[in-house]
């Protein structure tokens, strides 16, 4: 709590100040909004409940508004946390600021009295623990506490009515508070002061109840037992310290006031208002909303509390709004259903006998017989003969349900192959697949290598059974042996598992592929139930009888197999990792509670002693307990329906203690089952959908409701009535009050509670004849009381436990112990009637249903129903329901009938199916719409000659325009030489640098990164070098280089590198150490490119395709350009006939030559001149570029199966993903040298679907003949909106700061560097005395990045909407799209035209305002090399880039020198068009020297490359749209330096050769040339001279292009050659001949 700012004087009234401050500090529920509750505290409350349903309710209350970290235990009694949770609460609250109030004698006196009461309670508690109390003393204490409680006057009539029930609630709270008091350290002061009065003011009324005594002696999760003596001493010490603390007194006084404050002052209300208030509150109580007894210290304005949803509510209007919420309605229905299930009466002997008969008949009908088992064994023997003929070293064995006898008649036959270690698992199964396919004994032979356990599936021709053949599945075989041994030892095990499996099959929850549970998990669930019930039928496999066994280190004990069919063998191997984990857990426990040093020493000695231990544990109990099969079946359903919290605990059959999810580090979601031999993974993880889990829980409830109620052959009348009553309750929407929620409206007084509690402690005396029926009624009464506890107090009963391990034990112990006498009597009765004699006949199949029903008919008629005054005093509706059901139990036995019917058990609801691919419900993985392999591809029309020529030219144009010229290659070599000399001089003279990657492999773009590898002479590899230190030292040296900037060492990567940027060229590069394998990779790619020119053409086309679709950046979750080049090479190798050979398969001899590099064989055939001699058929493929490009798209969309095969260029034979063990990856691309490197490993399924969608759309676009407008072909074919359906590439895995994958936003290096600069700026401002905004920069929030753009490098800004660098989200063109579309920009454009027209002659070519061209969705390339900062180039260079400079004011002269960052908008990053300028061949004006005019006075028409951006057809009078050079794909507007004298080619019809210069917009795309439309840039006057006319020179592209896009200067440029300028008539004539509008226009 924050300190009050209004408490300036001690004369202020405390009450008014408290309420004022609390109303300011606390957020409460109002009439309009309900605020979310803290998830962490809700989960802590869930941990304190062993009941699955109650924990589920808590999870549904995650939207609660209260802050439970500092919740008052006395006010919010519905969710009182356990001691561990309270410790967390106290720790959180101890950091809050205490609110100070003026000291007063009254408050001091109250604090002293409170502390005295606390000391008195402590002494009484110590005495109570030292000496047991007699029943009389217990009753006396209960009476005194009841009298003390009754002295308090209720604040309202409603409170007076619910006083007795609230009494029990408060007594239970105080009992828990006394127990919690032992564990509260003295450092926690915030809540101790709140609860001390509650602990010490009154005695515990239920301290000696059996449940309380068990809780006091149980063990918590950390393994520390509650020592009573030490606990008393700790509490007394803490209380003595609190007595001297003034802050404790003040806070205690504050809490005293708040607790004594009245929630609603009824004295100020009129009688009519009080009556209306009472009626309204009675209506709210029906929906479990009650008025708070005392004012909440945290929610002072809240008057009501919903005990069902645990939400504080401000007033009645807010309560009515909360009642209408779906969450509240759902919780009410679940509460009602749970209460009704708990109120069901116990079964009668006839009922249990009928259940036994139903289970036995099911086992006989659907279970396998000895003959079926023999048939399955013969199948295994026959298959063993077939396989061992080809693989003699292998052997086959039967495992699974066929061997355990848990199989149904239609179950599969599981066969496992044992093979020697020298054999490979994938190769073995592939061979077995081929063997079985060739054999006539088996049909429908298929492979399922992508399953959790890879298998070969076939069907035996003779028997028709389905066989699943696996290999090396040793763990499953061990589990099978265990279950088989248990089935032989315990006769009820097999029929129970069969009934459970058949029930799961009927409900369709055993299908693992559709999101269900594996079938053998149900056997483990039955085994777990038989271990946990009281008394147990099966022992646990590990326990305290093993010397040195610790449940915390249970993973050190490993089960090794079954010995003599009676024991399980175990070994203890204490691993270092386990020891570290246990030490960490012990340290964590130490922080909560101090441990004794002697105990730690003993534990260490035990851990050392249990190393390398082994032994065996029995599988059967010494004295087996016999229970009827029907009773076990009903208890099994009840156990998993009501008793066991599935979402909280782990089903573990190894130990007796309940294992929590925290012990296994498994998430608290759905069902967790541990395999006893494979303990690391959850075998029920296939149930990964909450919808399926809720469906499973619903089926459990439906099954328990059906089998717990008496059923007849003609239909269950009682069940029908029961459902009718349930529907009536729901339709009336009048749920019972929370106080009376126990058994549908039972009001239980405190006297009745005392009587029943006393009767629980007394042994039950009964005769042999009427023992069963009498005990049933007593159990029913106890059940009523238990249900009252759960319903009346919400979560009180579940929160009274002191540890997770003790939460479930009292419930199981109490209920199962009460059933023990009835089990004995029932066994004798059943033995007399010869129904099921489990002690004599181990085979339950020998009894028949007819004998059971006929013999038990007489016994059921002699039952006597005994009554109990404590039960009959509860005159409630639940008792009437129970009596109705008891009347139905007295039906003749022959009328009781149970059947496993699908409609009954599923309630007619279809199963919930969840796809394992997309994780969506409603379909299976075979019908998943997101599976691109399921898309029906329409056949493509035949290709025409004209369309083929267009595709050829488009592919060639990709290479011509994007491949780096020779001059750029030369400049890259010069940069490398300069760096090498500098490093040799400054760092190490033995350093050698070499280029690799895109600079040398023949597939590099212009402005591609510089990939440099550094080696040191005298070292063949980096084994003896400290690579991290070398990289860091190299980064320090490179920072001294004047020509480099942005030096960044990255030492945490797989290959440590140093990143840098070359100032002059703007190229980015990285230096790696001994990346020699990549050099060989580069050489091989260059060799492939030199074999056939079509390889390079297709490689460049593929890279352009990937860039346009935004699927070519591995750092953002897609594939790298290197991976796409490998895809091109693989296609050309697999083409028939092939275009290129497999270089790694061409060698002399039978063995591949060895050229080992970094542990891998880097051999490939590199003698290209000898290829034609070795492979005469190499040049047989004569397909054109267009045909090959379309064939590539069709190959990867129609033929290649990404799921089954790997893209591998090292072999011609198909390589399967199963052979590489890459079945879990969506795309598998093998590195040709590093065979363990999958280039598609980082691609998610969502990104795979996006990539395949682009390929499918590309197949349709490039395969459908269409003739776009002249010069618009590239724009048509590479339209990203068409290729990606207008969608953005998935970026859910990308960092929001830098747009990369592999780290979270908090760990982003961009953010860290920005934070460092911010702190540095703050320190400078502090030194200068500027402290204005210093505090706002201490913590950086990504949402405030735009606030710091004035002093940041624009390259550090990155928009996570479009992914572009240089701006943030607020300034993104995508965000401004809607406003730009709706706003009228004609006037603003007109002003710009006027300003641009007034430019002085000789001024620089200015860059206009921001273009209104909208950024496309896929134009979000993250390559920083596409947007380098503009740099001034020396004037001795051969060319000069036409760098546009923004002008701050119209008509102002631009500044000379490099451009300033502040002069341009943050989202526009300027970029030079050409990196390496050359000297002009002719004279030029002095303006050229200042960088204000292009180098050549002559504007040369260049070929059009309008691949980027949409085309805007401007209306008459509209202004031009200027190009933004920050666009990453501006490279498409940079023509390469190519000869300009290529003769023009003509196609079908007349193709124009000229285009008006002013008819181009944006990236060179052709637009309309209407009156008033101006070009991209204002005309440049040539020294006030008239514009000359030149003869037209043939262009390098048969279509015209704006002269401003021509490459300025060329190595083969002829300066004296005249040129003609182009007019607008050509474009008009072209548009008249081609009336159809072009593709890709965004505006008309």
Curated annotation (Swiss-Prot):
Residues the record lists as Omega-N-methylarginine modifications: 1624
TM annotation in the entry: none
Amino acid composition bias (Basic and acidic residues), ranges on this chain: 36-46, 238-252, 582-603, 806-816, 1334-1348
Residues modified to Phosphoserine: 104, 134, 156
Subcellular location: Nucleus; Cytoplasm; Cytoplasm, Cytoplasmic ribonucleoprotein granule
Database matches in SUPFAM superfamilies: Nucleotidyltransferase (SSF81301), PAP/OAS1 substrate-binding domain (SSF81631), Retrovirus zinc finger-like domains (SSF57756)
Positions annotated to bind UTP: 998-1001, 1008-1011, 1081, 1103, 1121-1125, 1237
Family assignment from sequence similarity: Belongs to the DNA polymerase type-B-like family.
Domain notes per entry: Utilizes two multidomain functional modules during the switch from monouridylation to oligouridylation. The catalytic module (containing the 3 CCHC-type Zinc finger domains) is essential for both activities while the Lin28-interacting module (LIM) at the N-terminal part is indispensable for oligouridylation.
Protein name listed in UniProt: Terminal uridylyltransferase 4
Species, as recorded: Homo sapiens
